[in-house]
Amino acid sequence: DLGDHESIYIIPLSDVHIGEEGFNETLLDNIIKMVKKQDNLFVVLLGDLINNALKTSKSDVYTATMTPQQQVNYIVDKPKPIRHKILGSVSGNHEDRTSKDAGIDLSAVIAQFLDIPYDSASLVYQIKHGTKGSGKNNYVIYTTHGFGGGGSKGAKANKLQKLSELCLADLYVMGHIHDIVTFSDAVYVPDTRHDRMVLKKRTYLSTGSCLQYGGYAEKMLLRPGSEGYPLIHLSDGKVKIIT
């Protein structure tokens, strides 16, 4: 329950890539300041918070600006002023590199230091807000890091829509593709209390990154992604995406 706020805003923070040459520290600083200042603004973490370049990975260890340990230290210290407003975290493929090589889940370590809910694969949130007099608004939000490529908007949208095969939710959110893509659809669900079918709207969102263009993306001829993040706006039982 996020309190008596008439509306709620959530930043889906993903693909920060601390330790990468193109990491935009100013952008992260501004996000933390904004969350600290605004009472009804919260954060969900979607993985790849650190770049975690290893000798066995695609990332270049020689251009890294921090060691993996320094990256972990940075991300557990930086958001301390707002950690009570971080709703939870999932892991990304960059953190998973250490899980595969050494059996250490860096995302779990980060979540433990921040004292926030964590799952390596996905988290489902039941968000409630509003006053008792007007009734609480309820939303179900499914979050995961995501995987794979997909250069076109259509390919990215297809990846997003596949999330709806896993569970029924009001909003599906993923990261990984460094691009803001959003759309909605609808499906009929049974209302057994009233013996009817109800049309339910579902919203899909892939979020951006904290990474300036260059490095691996430029070498692989990938087009520039979305630097920055959308806002999830929850109000009156409706989901709106602000880009």
Where does each model-flagged region fall?
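Short, conserved, surface-exposed binding loops centered on an aromatic residue
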Residues: 117, 126-136, 161-166, 196
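Core catalytic region of metal-dependent phosphoesterases/phosphodiesterases
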Residues: 3-120
